[in-house]
Amino acid sequence: MGIWKKLFGEGGNPVDYYREGVELLKVGKYHEALTSFRLALRETPQDAAVLQQIAIAYTRIGMTDEAVKTYRTVLSYHPDTAGAHYGLGFLLLRQGRTDEGERHLRLFLETPPETPEAKRHVAHARETLEELARGHMPKPEA
């Protein structure tokens, strides 16, 4: 892990903390990923990609209030960040904040990502908005 390399001075190459965090997220090491993302953020403060990954890690460990705050931070620096609108929208819906969640899903769909992997997120947002329009409300978090 890059943290140990930095502490003990192993290797001459700079550590890519962002990439390290992404890899840690993939294998379910959410707390370790948070550490890597925080180190990456020190190198590039206000980086939307790093902040979004932090929000994802918070969500996965159940710290949804922190995830909401982090997504809001992303949007305060970068208002058009589609991924932050998507993540925030669904978190707000789970918290029972339907109007605000719906607004963020609509903002996500105004400028959705066009990558192949994003298609399922776009479809999920559209389906959710259709369900909301039919009066089917997601259950709030307990």
Which residues does each PLM region occupy?
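Alpha-helical segment of the N-proximal tetratricopeptide repeat
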Residues: G11-Q46
